[in-house]
Amino acid sequence: MIQIIYGQDRFLVLEKRKALIDAIQKEKQDVETFYFYASDHEFNFGQVIEAIETVSLFGAPRVVFFYVEQEKDLHLVDIDRLEKIVSSRLDVDLILAF
C-alpha cells in the first residue's frame, strides 16, 4: 500500500505519519518501521530503496516512511527508480510525505 501525505506544516505531516503507522501496527503484528528524511545531513536515497527492496528475515511486515520536506531536496530523489520499485513491491507499506 502506498500513502501520500502532502502539506507544508511539518507538525501536521508528522502527526498524520504517526496516525498511519499506528493504524498499520494495530492491524499487523511485529512491523519493521524505517524512517527517512531527505533533509538529514547524511541522507542517502539508496537506503530508502534498500529498505523497500530488502526482504524481512522473519517475514515481518514493513513500513517505510520517506519525507521530502523542502523542494530543494527533491534533487536527492531518483523518482524513476522509486516509481519502478514501488510499482513492483506490494509487500511494503510506503508512506511518502512532501
Predicted features by range, described:
Residues 2-98:
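Non-catalytic interfacial helical region
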